[in-house]
């Protein structure tokens, strides 16, 4: 077996129709994500990050609850930048410490989420990117 050296290698090994990320407890319309869909989304996310001046070596903090959306965000961002998942239960002072320590270029939060991470990022001049889950 060859050595996997990056996210692209990991995504490439899955058959197009194979399940890459499951969505237990979701409605049938919210089906699991296939490797083909995850690869396509990773390309879109990397392109979007690059258009916003974020690339390899740049740190992107992610504040999302555990679940398929977090897994997808982590994998797709990691395809083009350094991911730094942060606990959504952190307090404002903890987010301040970690966002400073990470030197994050962007923060991803769920649309409409009132996390203190958002206010900290805005005060620090860190771009806040909102994840809009596809619930159809």
Named regions from a protein language model:
Residues 75-76, 120:
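Hydrophobic/aromatic ligand-binding patch that stacks against planar heteroaromatic rings
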Residues 1-22, 40:
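A short N-terminal helical cap/helix-turn-helix that marks the beginning
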Residues 11-14, 25, 36, 111, ...:
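Residues at the C-termini of beta-strands that transition into short coil/loop
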């Amino acid at each position: 077996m060859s050595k996997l050296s990056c996210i692209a290698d990991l995504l490439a090994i899955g058959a197009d129709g194979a399940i890459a990320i499951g969505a237990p407890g979701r409605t049938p319309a919210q089906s699991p994500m296939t490797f083909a869909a995850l690869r396509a989304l990773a390309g879109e996310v990397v392109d979007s990050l690059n258009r916003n001046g974020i690339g390899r070596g740049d740190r992107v903090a992610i504040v999302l609850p555990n679940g398929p959306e977090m897994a997808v965000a982590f994998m797709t961002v990691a395809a083009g930048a350094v991911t730094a998942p942060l606990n959504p239960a952190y307090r404002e002072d903890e987010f301040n410490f970690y966002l400073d320590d990470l030197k994050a270029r962007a923060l991803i939060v769920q649309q409409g989420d009132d996390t203190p991470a958002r206010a900290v990022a805005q005060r620090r001049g860190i771009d806040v990117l909102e994840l809009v889950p596809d619930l159809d």
